[in-house]
């Protein structure tokens, strides 16, 4: 199978905008060479939009304390990436979270007056006290973001701008408590998003935003707010109610004027994982693309994130990227190692890629060996990083025979990787996959030692995790990423 087959066999009912969003704020900021390779990969796979998720990893003037340890992108670099994307017919859409997920700003004393809860808040989902992470919903913070927009947006030729706006966890717990009690949290949220929208439109751009708050309450979606915006309906688990949410958004857009745009955003399921949640990813992608075509979405934005240390290798995105491209275009979706190998060879990832493709497919299904699931993350990854009572909680209810089955799976993957030609073993994707397999294997050996109450074996594997695996992780990181964020990622080991 070749990539050309996607467009050649594409359905006329395919999705017009085929986008990919890469998180560059949770640790990993790729080198410019790695960005260039990504853009080339996306172009070859028929993607036509790229977004880089940014919270603090842009070198804003006068805000050096926020990004000084992050190896941030510069204006010159963003302009170079914009040019590179235009040359490959890819729209480079600016993405800067502007309401929630701003912990890396608000942890500094200088910015705490902008916070909804300057001293932190109680997170109902994580059931713990968290540091401030959401701007207050007021003119002051909208003006602050406007000044950042003035500096950030001239680097992009796109007429769209994704301001994020997802998960403002503590909204209504601090400065806006009385207003939310009086007017309702969603109304306070929409009022502030309208403030930001005015600042976006000043730059001649259309505001994109995550739709979770909009869809979080039942009832009719305020149609007027959606005018000249692009809501993005995101959901990363198979079985996400895309149909119901698309129906609500489509109805609101028709009420607002009929020709409104909206996107759907599935995920690669690579985050909080070593690459072992592929089964969930492919179902999620298929369901999102199906709903996008059914309800006339203008785009699908495949996302990948780096929550809690960004330990997921980029190679874990390869199969989801290929499958999503085919699904978006309504083309035949590759399924076998041989089919993926043909595509990987064409993309220049490997010359002889069948063994690599087989190993990547098998590794992606590793978590299927264990019946216990943890929402939005890999249980194998949790077996590696969880400590103390958290590790005991992860292991609760996990039977020894399932750990053994997963270890058998790892052993088979290791045998397959031995078939990868020697000339291909210097490829970054091979090194990433080898490391991911080693880390998953260590996690399973740690789990086995716990179940056997073998303190000596557990101590040995934990020493390996904190020693050779940590060292190898840093070495592989540096092959394609900047130094910023690495120390934070290593602190999890």
Which residues does each PLM region occupy?
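Substrate-binding groove of N-acetylhexosamine-processing glycoside hydrolases
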Residues: 3, 8, 80-83, 89, ...
């Amino acid at each position: 199978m070749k990539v050309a087959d996607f467009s050649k066999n594409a359905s006329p009912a395919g999705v017009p905008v085929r986008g990919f969003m890469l998180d560059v704020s949770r640790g990993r900021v790729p080198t410019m060479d790695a960005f260039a390779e990504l853009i080339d990969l996306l172009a070859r796979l028929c993607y036509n939009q790229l977004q880089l998720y940014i919270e603090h990893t842009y070198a804003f003037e006068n805000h050096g304390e926020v990004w000084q340890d992050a190896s941030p992108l510069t204006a010159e670099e963003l302009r170079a990436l914009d040019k590179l994307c235009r040359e490959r017919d890819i729209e480079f859409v600016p993405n800067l979270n502007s309401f929630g997920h701003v912990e890396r700003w608000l942890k500094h004393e200088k910015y705490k007056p902008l916070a909804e809860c300057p001293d932190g808040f109680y997170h109902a989902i994580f059931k713990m006290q968290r540091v401030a992470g959401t701007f207050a919903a007021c003119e002051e913070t909208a003006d602050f973001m406007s000044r950042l927009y003035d500096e950030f947006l001239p680097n992009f030729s796109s007429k769209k701008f994704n301001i994020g706006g997802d998960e403002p966890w503590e909204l209504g717990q601090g400065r806006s408590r009385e207003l939310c009690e009086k007017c309702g949290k969603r109304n306070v949220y929409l009022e502030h998003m309208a403030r930001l929208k005015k600042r976006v439109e000043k730059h001649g751009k259309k505001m994109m935003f995550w739709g979770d708050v909009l869809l979080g309450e039942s009832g009719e979606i305020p149609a007027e707010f959606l005018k000249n915006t692009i809501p993005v309906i995101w959901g990363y688990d198979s079985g996400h109610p895309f149909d119901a949410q698309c129906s609500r958004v489509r109805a609101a857009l028709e009420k607002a004027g009929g020709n409104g745009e909206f996107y759907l955003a599935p995920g690669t399921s690579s985050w909080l994982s070593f690459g072992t949640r592929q089964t969930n990813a492919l179902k999620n992608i298929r369901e999102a693309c199906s709903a996008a075509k059914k309800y006339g979405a203008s785009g699908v934005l495949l996302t990948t994130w780096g929550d809690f240390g960004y330990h997921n290798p980029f190679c874990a995105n390869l199969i989801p990227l290929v499958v999503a491209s085919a699904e978006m275009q309504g083309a035949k979706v590759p399924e076998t190692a041989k089919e993926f190998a043909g595509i990987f060879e064409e993309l220049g990832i490997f010359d002889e890629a069948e063994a690599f493709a087989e190993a990547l497919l098998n590794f992606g299904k590793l978590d299927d060996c264990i019946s216990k699931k943890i929402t939005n993350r890999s249980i194998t990854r949790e077996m590696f990083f969880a400590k103390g009572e958290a590790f005991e909680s992860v292991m609760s209810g996990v039977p020894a025979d399932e750990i053994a089955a997963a270890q058998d799976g790892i052993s088979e993957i290791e045998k397959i990787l031995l078939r990868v030609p020697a000339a291909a073993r210097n490829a970054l994707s091979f090194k990433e996959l080898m490391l991911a397999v080693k880390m998953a294997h260590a996690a399973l050996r740690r789990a086995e030692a716990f179940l056997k109450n073998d303190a000596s074996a557990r101590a040995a594997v934990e020493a390996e995790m904190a020693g050779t695996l940590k060292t190898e992780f840093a070495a592989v990181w540096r092959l394609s990423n900047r130094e910023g964020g690495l120390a934070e990622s290593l602190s999890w080991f």
